[in-house]
Amino acid sequence: MAIKRGVRLQCNESKSINYITTKNAKNNPDRLSLNKFCPKCRKVTTHVEIKKK
């Protein structure tokens, strides 16, 4: 069975956490990086996976 875990995506510019998604940790061990819309910046920016506190 695939190991799926929840990850949080943080905007690189405003540092706000805007999205929560899941990823397969076995197939994608690297950090997730996606271009998404940031409501605080009001534009499309790069969002990266952050560690849980």
Curated annotation (Swiss-Prot):
Pfam families: Ribosomal_L33 (PF00471). InterPro entries: Ribosomal_bL33 (IPR001705), Ribosomal_bL33_CS (IPR018264), Ribosomal_bL33_sf (IPR038584), Ribosomal_zn-bd (IPR011332). HAMAP family: Ribosomal_bL33. Keywords: Ribonucleoprotein, Ribosomal protein. GO terms for biological process: translation. PANTHER family: 50S RIBOSOMAL PROTEIN L33, CHLOROPLASTIC (PTHR43168), LARGE RIBOSOMAL SUBUNIT PROTEIN BL33A (PTHR43168:SF6). SUPFAM superfamilies: Zn-binding ribosomal proteins (SSF57829). This is Large ribosomal subunit protein bL33. One of its GO terms (cellular component) is cytoplasm. GO terms for molecular function: structural constituent of ribosome. The lineage of its organism: Bacteria, Bacillati, Mycoplasmatota, Mycoplasmoidales, Mycoplasmoidaceae. It comes from Ureaplasma parvum serovar 3 (strain ATCC 700970). Belongs to the bacterial ribosomal protein bL33 family.
